[in-house]
Amino acid sequence: KQPLHALPLLGASLGLAAAGILMSLAASKTRPYSYIPILIGAICAIPSVLSTLMPQQMGHIWILTSAVTALTASALPWMCLSFARISVDSPHSESEIFALPNDIDYQDIKRRYIAGSTMLFIGRICVAALLLIAAPLLNTLDTPLGSALCLAAFLGMLLDSRQIYTFREMCVTVGAAGIGIIVTGSLSVQTHQEFSIPLILLMLACAFATILFTYVLRKHTLFATRVADAAETICIMLILPLAYLAITL
């Protein structure tokens, strides 16, 4: 019997990529969105092939895949902004301040913005899908560090949603993070029953903090912003150490 994250997932990944290619050929007007199944299928095929060839190392392979994916999620806005070539020229001298502005091609800026925004949306969907695919396997490993890695990745994704201002990206990011946290909590409690009480208390504390800063404290204070930034930074910094410990221990 083949594990789900090996040969079966490889077949599903190839089918998803093939469906994306057919979608791009059939619907040229929505061609950028056909890259979503192509990218998800192509990226999932890599750890699936490695897991099929090295089934004993399947857990390690998906731990590395999840860690790289979670770190890539934090760099997506910068990567898409660089790809769209949108920059702001700030004057550095008095002559530049009083100089006549250069002509601005608004249509070109609009096209670049649409391209960058679409790429960012596609990237967020791919990251969310990869983390959700890997979450069941990581939460059923012998070590609870796999669950800790998933929790850090999804919490970082949830905290990163504070910087999102488009409705569709907000739905994808918050929805995937919420589903991932629920899956992590339910599977890790079943697999590692000795950690059920601390995990439940941690999730209750996170829910209380979210409700407090979202609904109770209507005014966004500088303290709350700094606490959220610090929490997001800690989640990102914990990903690589947790992945290393989950592999070596």
Task: Label each PLM-derived region with a short phrase.
Residues C171, G178-R218:
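C-terminal hydrophobic structural anchor segments
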Residues L4, P8-A19, I36-T173, G185-H192:
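Generic multipass alpha-helical transmembrane bundles of integral membrane proteins
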Residues A19-R31, L155-T166, I211-T221:
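C-terminal ends of transmembrane helices
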Residues R218-M237:
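Interfacial loop-to-transmembrane junctions
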Residues A243-L249:
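Juxtamembrane boundary at the C-terminal end of a transmembrane helix
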Residues R31-A42, E169-G178, R226-E232:
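Cytoplasmic-side transmembrane-helix entry/capping segments in multi-pass membrane proteins
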